[in-house]
């Protein structure tokens, strides 16, 4: 890969970063991570560098720049370029440049590794030019005052991050919502395969998004999905933008869905989502140890078995899905469903593994018996009607009896067994006698 590193001679932070990159490249004999680099120096502000890459024979452009803020804090940032509205800071109105989500994420993660003490690392939303670019590009910046712009420690950190960025398994996304420093998108990119290209902020940019701009975000980011920070975006805007994404055929992923992608290839994940949609239009899917290729199928558990296991310990149940090569499904409100997705070749074993998991959780919490292929769950619960028939008034005595404690009322000892009712649930599980 050939990379152009562009800075302005009038930008002290850009000069600082270039100097440290040159030092690092001297140590690495001119290349790093299989990439070769070409330095390009321009005059004036980089935000006005329209067409600067038109004659460059490269695959990627990285702008080395300073970052300024009305509330200055030491920060290292990356972001794509473009304008959702007026071109107040270079470029053209309502125009987005080609982004480089995978390299942006890799650089962000490398910045986090090398970040000096006292600095923080984040994306920024798309907010300035240049827009007239031919190659995928992004800015990497040191902020936010001259003290940081000339800081050799920050300059070295950015240099090592640019050269050490190593994209792997990135899933390119667009981000909608949040503040200027895109906190949720930053957290997602640092903890998952989610790699953002263009990002729009809640306060100034989301209201500007129409079909044309959303489509431009997707195309210029080469995004396969979108993330909406629902806590930061007004409900009306969420609905409006969601409708646009539906028209464009772009899926929306929640933060949990992105962080649970695991190592599954994106096309396989799309197939998982397609199977989930046959269960219900808003069904969510959560990937566990599912990876590889092959035909995917839905497998189903007995809904009563799953319900009983959930009631016993839902947290442990979901946690123990982790090592299994499955995706579990849930409603939009995160209610666990009895359908799972697995590779067809594993489906019989997966059903047995899931049955075994549920049975173990139930046996750990309930009184059970095995009768041939039936799991029998016996429960004894407090019956308020029986207590009333014995004259026990509602109140503390009810709570004691429900807790399995005898009470004295009107000269008689009333034991829990006198005010209890026994129930029995029978669940047919083929091969149960062989389960451990």
From Swiss-Prot:
Pfam families: tRNA_deacylase. SUPFAM superfamilies: AF0625-like (SSF142535). It is an enzyme of class 3 (hydrolase). The keyword Protein transport does not apply. Its cofactor is Zn(2+). It comes from the Archaea. The keyword Membrane does not apply. Keywords: Hydrolase, Metal-binding, Zinc. InterPro entries: Deacylase_DtdA_archaea, DtdA. It catalyses: a D-aminoacyl-tRNA + H2O = a tRNA + a D-alpha-amino acid + H(+); glycyl-tRNA(Ala) + H2O = tRNA(Ala) + glycine + H(+). Binds 2 Zn(2+) ions per subunit. One of its GO terms (molecular function) is D-aminoacyl-tRNA deacylase activity. NCBIfam families: PRK14866.1-3. D-aminoacyl-tRNA deacylase with broad substrate specificity. By recycling D-aminoacyl-tRNA to D-amino acids and free tRNA molecules, this enzyme counteracts the toxicity associated with the formation of D-aminoacyl-tRNA entities in vivo. Monomer. HAMAP family: Deacylase_DtdA. This is D-aminoacyl-tRNA deacylase. It comes from Methanoregula boonei (strain DSM 21154 / JCM 14090 / 6A8). The lineage of its organism: Archaea, Methanobacteriati, Methanobacteriota, Stenosarchaea group, Methanomicrobia.
